[in-house]
From Swiss-Prot:
This is NADH-ubiquinone oxidoreductase chain 3. Belongs to the complex I subunit 3 family. GO terms for cellular component: mitochondrial inner membrane; NADH dehydrogenase complex. PANTHER family: NADH-UBIQUINONE OXIDOREDUCTASE CHAIN 3. It is found in: Mitochondrion inner membrane. The keyword Translocase applies. The chain crosses the membrane at residues 4-24, 55-75, 86-106. The gene is MT-ND3. Core subunit of respiratory chain NADH dehydrogenase (Complex I) which is composed of 45 different subunits. Interacts with TMEM186. Interacts with TMEM242. GO terms for molecular function: NADH dehydrogenase (ubiquinone) activity.
Amino acid sequence: MNMFIVMMINIILSMSLIIIAFWLPQLNLYTEKANPYECGFDPMSSARLPFSMKFFLVAITFLLFDLEIALLLPLPWAIQIPNIKITMLTAFILVTVLALGLAYEWMQKGLEWTE
C-alpha cells in the first residue's frame, strides 16, 4: 500500500511537470524569443555558426566513456552480492561493446583531426 502511494505521487508529479513544460512556452509566442541576444547591437554575422563534426564525434565518444565510468564505478560494491558471475559478465559485456565501438571509430578515422 505504501509503495502504491509513492508510485502514484511520482506519476502525478511527473505528469504535472510534463504538462507545465508543454503549456508554459505557448503563453508568450513572439519572434524576439527566437532570436539570439546581441546586447542591443545589430549582429555582425550569423549567431548560429556551424560546428565541426569531428568535435561532435569526439564529444560523443567522451560522453560514452564518461557513462562507462559512471556505470562501472559501483562495481566493487556489486561484487559483494552472492551472484557475482552475472555482475562480472554484465560489466565485461559493457566494456567489450564500448571497446569494439571505439575500435570501429578509430578504424573509420573518426578520431583524427588532420584531414
